[in-house]
Amino acid sequence: MGGLAALAREAGHKVTGCDAGVYPPMSDQLKALGIELMEGFGVEQMQLKPDLYVIGNVVSRSRLPSGEPKFPLMEAILESGSPYTSGPQWLSEHVLQGRHVLAVAGTHGKTSTTSMLAWILEAAGLEPGFLVGGVPLNFGVSARLGKVAAGHARNYFVIEADEYDTAFFDKRSKFVHYRPRTAVLNNLEFDHADIFDDLPAIERQFHHLVRTVPGLGRLVVNGLEESLTRVLAQGCWSEVRSFGAAVSDFSAVGEPHNFEVLRHGQKLAEVKWDLGGVHNQLNALAAIAAAEHVGVEVSMAAQALAS
């Protein structure tokens, strides 16, 4: 929600926000943008009379042991008939519409892979917009609009795509709102036991995301994940590029900090960087495969990761 507020501010809106508590680094970023933050969810905030309330999924209709609403501001919004929407819906309508969206989904590695992909596109001169669930050091902000030109071929937005539900009034996963042309399915394990009964329930949500990718789009899928194989088995209508496994379209040979990127056994590039761990090696392959879909050569992507 902090990144969304930053995007709205960059777009020229006056933005205020509230939460139970706001902490660095996001609080510092929002303060620097001139976004006023209020603690708590009191009804006195109705006096601001905004054009629109954007509701985060932390908000609910639940009540305290005393019987009082836990989120009195939300109750006042509903009683007054004030306009409201969810964060993902606002993004879809005001930021993502008409853009080539590159979405990064998965149980793990979303923030890292989204940051890598955005940086690759930046290094390639594509000036992407992005929304990341953290503050990447190489950008210094969690979100920006990027180059926006209606109908322009280079009009990209990279977004961290979460499978958690959208809002108390919209129980679909957030990522179904984003309608990506390029979607990374990084991995898939059981998570969010508060809203999902089992792994198949999450797999169904991931397949909902797959359904939104157009025929000329691309799915970048971890070939090591049986759960993602099951997701695609439910139906797939787009080009698929796999990564990770030896027989994948994109694989790696070497140590995680110094490895060759292969396509069907043929060397395409070499990545030398300070990051370690096989997980980051896989994240890099995913970002490289996604960037290729928008015309970034693998060698250029590898150079960007090294920087």
What is the predicted function of each stretch?
Residues 19, 135, 142-144, 244-254:
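Short linear motifs in intrinsically disordered
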Residues 14-19, 129-131, 242:
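Short beta-strand "acidic-cap" motif of Rossmann-like dinucleotide-binding folds
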Residues 41, 88, 108, 135, ...:
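Short, well-ordered turn and helix-capping elements at secondary-structure junctions
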Residues 7-10, 31, 45, 65-223, ...:
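Phosphate-binding loop of NTP-binding sites
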Residues 1-86, 90, 218, 226, ...:
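N-terminal leader/targeting and accessory segments in enzymes
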Residues 56, 190, 196-207, 217-218, ...:
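Adenine nucleotide phosphate-binding catalytic loops in nucleotide-utilizing enzymes
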